[in-house]
């Protein structure tokens, strides 16, 4: 029986962990960029066998757990390390009376989906990720939404974490002018605008699209808002497939996975 344990990561673990967080996606990985923020937030769990071979970050809010950044050293795949890390994160959530656990998995990632299924996570919703290029664009008419129905936004995305909305959360967002809408011919598109806490100059938008004309209004506003406020990129997350719009680029689809803990 070889020595192994789960513990909180520390500053000195960085290099040994980043070694296996290099080529996760075709473009690389984001772990290096968020490393110090996640360390500050705490609950960055590390699986150690002589040296670190896996990590997973958990974010606890209201009554939910958000699980993110599961990375396993390729030499230690199929050792159930991901499952053990997730189960550990859940156990801390349960002690603190959290009711649900969520994670986001690329719809093509069969291994992660079966790992989540084996831990009783269900495919709850599908979300699509688009990027939009910031640029000067005055071709819009939008309004700030004063009161928004939680049926339009059951979740909003805060720094790539799907947070279940409450009346209070939506009221706070609208009082900060973070919720915009375009309303034409009885159809409307709404968007919640946020910053990516861990990566600079990135606008994250949760979008609910009603028609092409209202969508165009909102996308044009977002482009211009990002341009005027020196954002480098706009990341849009939505349940629907969006129609063609200049410099809107479909990236990838995800399953929002959900597990009840009670």
Regions found by a protein language model. Give the residues of each.
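Glycine-rich acetyl-CoA-binding "A-motif" of GNAT/NAT acetyltransferases
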Residues: 50-54, 111, 188-190
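Conserved N-terminal entry element of GNAT/NAT acetyltransferase domains
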Residues: 1-11, 134-147, 262
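A conserved beta-strand-loop-helix scaffold within acyl/acetyltransferase catalytic domains
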Residues: 22, 28-45, 54-70, 191-200
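Conserved active-site alpha-helix within GNAT-family acetyltransferase domains
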Residues: 83, 107-125, 240-252
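Conserved acetyl-CoA-binding loop-helix of GNAT-fold acetyltransferases
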Residues: 72, 78-91, 114, 213-224
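Conserved catalytic-core motifs of GNAT/GCN5-like acyltransferases
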Residues: 60-63, 102-104, 122-135, 249-261
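Amide-forming acyltransferase catalytic core, primarily the GNAT-like/NAT-type
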Residues: 119-199
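Conserved GNAT acetyl-CoA-binding A-motif
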Residues: 93-108, 228-238
């Amino acid at each position: 029986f070889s020595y192994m344990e789960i513990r909180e990561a520390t500053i000195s673990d960085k290099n040994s962990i980043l070694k296996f967080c290099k080529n996760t996606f075709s473009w690389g990985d984001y772990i290096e960029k968020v490393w110090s923020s996640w360390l500050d937030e705490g609950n960055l769990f590390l699986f150690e066998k002589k040296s670190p071979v896996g990590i997973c970050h958990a974010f606890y809010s209201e009554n939910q757990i958000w699980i993110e950044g599961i990375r396993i050293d390729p030499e230690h795949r199929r050792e159930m390390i991901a499952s053990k890390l997730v189960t550990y994160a859940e156990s801390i959530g349960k002690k603190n009376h959290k009711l649900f656990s969520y994670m986001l998995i690329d719809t093509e990632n069969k291994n992660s989906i079966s790992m989540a299924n084996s831990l009783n996570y269900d495919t709850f919703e599908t979300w699509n990720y688009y990027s939009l290029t910031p640029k000067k664009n005055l071709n819009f008419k939008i309004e700030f939404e004063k009161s928004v129905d939680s049926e339009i936004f059951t979740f909003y995305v805060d720094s790539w974490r799907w947070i279940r909305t409450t009346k209070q959360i939506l009221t706070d967002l609208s009082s900060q002018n973070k919720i915009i809408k375009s309303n034409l011919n009885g159809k409307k598109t709404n968007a919640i605008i946020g910053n990516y806490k861990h990566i600079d100059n990135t606008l994250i938008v949760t979008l609910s699209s009603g028609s092409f004309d209202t969508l165009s209004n909102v996308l044009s506003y977002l482009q211009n808002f990002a341009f005027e406020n020196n954002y480098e990129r706009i990341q849009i997350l939505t349940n629907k497939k969006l129609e063609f719009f200049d410099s809107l680029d479909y990236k990838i689809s995800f399953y929002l996975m959900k597990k009840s803990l009670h």
